[in-house]
């Protein structure tokens, strides 16, 4: 079964074409990135395994034209991987926000589209772009089944006391202001993968997953269900991130608004685009640049990394308390998979939980491995995530029922 996976942003779209033999056996046929949609000149980077990348510069006025260009590439005589577009069996979309309307992935039809539209208010940067991708496929390939896989769905199992904010209840009833959480597709995938690696029963274990990259979140998974997560109403809550502040006293917002006469956009820019690693270090939003600057003696860069590691440790400890125990900690994402020093610092700071860290086993980047010693009460793993594969798996599951 050949599935096209799409992840549409406001001015870009990522794509993968996977040939799914079954849920666990698959091959990647092609992947790529369409950038600068709506600008004077766009760019498509198309990659086929074991071939040189193919780059095209051309105007791409909208998402429909972007997806049309991708489809043309997939059947191109020189760079294509399909004989005909009829070989594509289904399309899976990453959708940022499903609110409390979608607790699982859904086959896309008119009611699902209406539901995604209702959630645009909750994710104004992402959901409209996701919808553009869905509507573009509808116009180009009207007969093909489409599936929406929501970033928020996995966290819909959180109990009320975990997802509610202690603000007037009517804001929840009227405006759906509550904690939703994100990266759900990744958290579930790496938790299941790590449980299998460690020989644990995913549905009978207490697991903390740390998806750490330019955006980052930590999730408590108890017996296969998300029971708490660090991101909240928006992806700005939680750990320190590349340009996002993470947890912050709400009073700071009104203080900055009053003192500097900031409007809503101004405050949003501060919290989402000027904070985190970038705001503290003044160097970069990239953890690799921060660590390099810290090694050269830059105090602010070192402070940014220590704040980040401290927050992650706090969440692991808090979630162990929330679940009344801990069996496994999982690291994934760009930082989680590749930054040995972050994993070591976080884990040695949590040794009281029963983590017997293995420094030698930790010397790995981008591989799946247990990084605690045999007999450690709490198992720690580092594993690669693959959100596109999960989207393809969900698409296959829902379209072959």
Where on the chain are the PLM-derived regions?
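Glycine-rich phosphate-binding loop of actin/hexokinase-like ATP-binding domains
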Residues: 154-259
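N-terminal glycine/serine-rich phosphate-binding loop of ATP-dependent small-molecule kinases
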Residues: 1-99
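Catalytic phosphate/nucleotide-handling subdomain of diverse soluble enzymes
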Residues: 221-222, 227-263, 269, 333-364
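Adenine-nucleotide phosphate-binding core of ATP-dependent small-molecule kinases
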Residues: 269, 276-280, 287-322
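Phosphate/pyrophosphate-binding loops at sites that engage ATP/ADP/AMP, CoA/4′-phosphopantetheine
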Residues: 73-88, 196-201, 316-327
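Glycine-rich beta-strand-to-loop/alpha-helix junction loops that act as flexible
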Residues: 9, 93-97, 212, 330-338
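Short beta-strand-loop/turn "lid" adjacent to the catalytic site in phosphate-handling enzymes
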Residues: 74, 78-126, 147, 154-162
